[in-house]
Amino acid sequence: MPLLDSFTVDHTRMNAPAVRVAKHMSTPKGDAITVFDLRFCTPNKEILSERGIHTLEHLFAGFMRDHLNSSNVEIIDISPMGCRTGFYMSLIGEPTEHQVAVAWLAAMEDVLKVVEQSEIPELNEYQCGTYEMHSLEQAQEIARNIIAAGVSVNRNDDLKLSDEILGKL
């Protein structure tokens, strides 16, 4: 099985909260696609609560679009990582890590402005596979933690696993 890009970086050296360009690629027509690793938690040390990450999934996707989409950037998808330490964001365009960090912090501020759980988008059995597994309180706690810590940048060159280490794994 081919080694996926996300497994060629050293998770023991990742900072969090931090943004990282996980992948650049182009469509056959030449459109740039960028995948970002939005790392909320330090891998293997912290984890996002399942209710909190699920509520963030519903809120974060819309709020990030509000702050990052433009004439040359369009978010395709924002999905939680299976390890529950962050989200992957795929988009058309090539915003800088700084632009993404600014949008991320603004989106976290928006999460704090949500007053009631009933304001969470698509919170019903028709549009959500586990619509009862949500917590606005936990999502807002995550948002407060991100705002308090700030968002840094993880660079692939700093995190690259050596061929020697990869050969031993």
From Swiss-Prot:
InterPro entries: LuxS_sf, Metalloenz_LuxS/M16, S-ribosylhomocysteinase. NCBIfam families: PRK02260.1-2. It catalyses: S-(5-deoxy-D-ribos-5-yl)-L-homocysteine = (S)-4,5-dihydroxypentane-2,3-dione + L-homocysteine. Belongs to the LuxS family. This is S-ribosylhomocysteine lyase. The gene is luxS. Homodimer. One of its GO terms (molecular function) is iron ion binding. The lineage of its organism: Bacteria, Pseudomonadati, Pseudomonadota, Gammaproteobacteria, Alteromonadales.
